[in-house]
Amino acid sequence: MKKDDYLVEIRNVLKQNPFILVGVSDIEGEEICRFLKKEKIEFESVKLSNESPYWEEIPAEIKEKVNNIILSGRKVMSLCIGGNMPEAIFSIAAAWHAGPDEDKPYSPIEQLSLAIKKDISPYYRLIGANSRGFIYAMREEAAAMLKGFGARSKYKSILKDAGITDYDLEDYKQKVYDSGEAGMERIPETYRAGIGLVIREIRRKDRAAQGITQEQELQAERAVMKSYLIGSVTVVDMHDAKPAAVFDRLVETEKYGLLMLSANGGSYFLGPWSKVKKFEEHFPEGKVGGEPPIRGHWSGNYSRPLVVDFVESLEKVKDKSKLHEKSELFMKL
């Protein structure tokens, strides 16, 4: 389906005064709720875990309510909820694109904004980029936006929508910001500090929306300090830390590969799309997403030795005495 046809379909559903259910498991779900409130569109939200934002996890009373609404003949739209839901529900669950002709997939908030406003605000473009590819994708989106005519007005719009004040920006420049921060070189220097702060805030709010506590942030810092290398891939034994809290502190590793291993048997890999495809081929029951053909992420429940052995073979490691060299790409948040 072409983009214009798909957006017309969303608009047609919205014209029918649907019951809208928003799954909130991250910052995008929260921003969609704010957007709908601003547009004075009625909706109901349900809190879901970031690890399992699926229909199957929705409380029974809400499912019953939705089913009764469907039986009454009223249209139902769901946002940011995956899984096997009733076919009658019009679902905007994840990134959508029309194939190779599209520059990039649209996240749910971008789809909704295009359907209602016929445009995507600069801030929502960053939120969408965060959903597609986290920090790297946001940097690239900002670099693309802040060029040529209109760049300054877009920059001001981003700061305003992110809730960044002049005081916040000056404080950030004095205490934290380094103009030579890796990965920000493509963003014009005039806007670099402000965008750096906005990206940091989006990731902080995203982790908070996922339910990551201060104690889990500290757990992530401790785990990251013990990270090591298998070839060019950085490996972190997360124990009970959360993947987002670990990744945000090791973002520069994504260009080579980051493997996160949790205590409950979950494995998470982020890195170049070529390596993600290798994971997908070797572990077909895992889940894959991201921004092909540039970068992506894979996750699955496989034994630690199995995953580590695969990474060793992927990296063609022969001298295992150097497997535990420390990674130096730690970023203090």
PLM regions with names:
Residues 95-181:
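Short alpha-helices
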